[in-house]
Structure formats: structure tokens, C-alpha cells
Amino acid sequence: MAVALTAHLQMPTMEPPDKEATVTAFETLLQEARSLDLARVDDRFRLGELAEAMRRDHPAGDLFERLAIDLEVDPGQLTEAWYVAMAFPPATRRPGLPWEIYRILRYHPERHELVSLAAHHSWDQARVERELADRFATQLGRAAG
């Protein structure tokens, strides 16, 4: 599977040496991605960060699909890891929170505040969903009032 993702990068070229350094960096990122345990929240965040680094260095339109094939994961799972990692920079992440809480909050404008509250009060997924519903109801009340 790795051949599909990296074959085009290994072809001999007359490119400047910088290209080789980029290939080496890409290979290093790919090797790290292959070693991740996606059952761990930290590793899911890391997968998203690695996907972003690869996307910046090799902006191919089908990069995530090819990477998903190489890693034998669903492309949606890879895209989700990328989006959640971009929505929650390392300084905003809280130890001990399940991935689902980050996933639920990834689009919310107050996601960093909500993650802090969830961590501080040991909220589970159901409690986070109730908080979101309460905040939405409050906003609707203000708009109607």
C-alpha cells in the first residue's frame, strides 16, 4: 500500500537537492503516521498534525485519500483527525478528554472554552451535548425576545 503513496516521490529527477530533503521529510512523517495507535486520543491528534504537515509540503488533491489507503484507515477518519487537530491546537487540548468530545465541539465557536469546562468538570459526551443544547436554547430565546 505504501507504494501508491510514495512511488511518485521516489522517481529519479533532475530536481535540486531540496526535493530530496522534502521526500525524506515526507517519508519521516509517513513512517511516524504508520506507527500511531488511533485508539489513543493523542495519536489521533498527531495523525491530524502529520496530515497537515504532509498537505503543506505536498498539496496533492488526493493526498488524504492516498494516505488513508497507506494507513489502512477510512478517509473520513483521517479527514476528521486533521480537522479536529486544526480546530484544537496543542495549547487548547486537555488530558483525559475522550476524542468524541473534541469531535463534537470541532465546529463550535466557543470550543476552547467548552473543552476547558468539560475537562474541569469531568463532563462526558452526554453532558457536553446537554451544554450545547442549553446554549443553543439560550441563543434562540435571546433572538426571539
Predicted regions: what they are:
Residues 137-145:
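Long, compositionally biased
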Residues 1-71, 116-119:
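N-terminal acidic-hydrophobic amphipathic loop/helix motif that frequently occurs adjacent to catalytic
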Residues 44, 61-138:
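Amphipathic alpha-helical "recognition" segments
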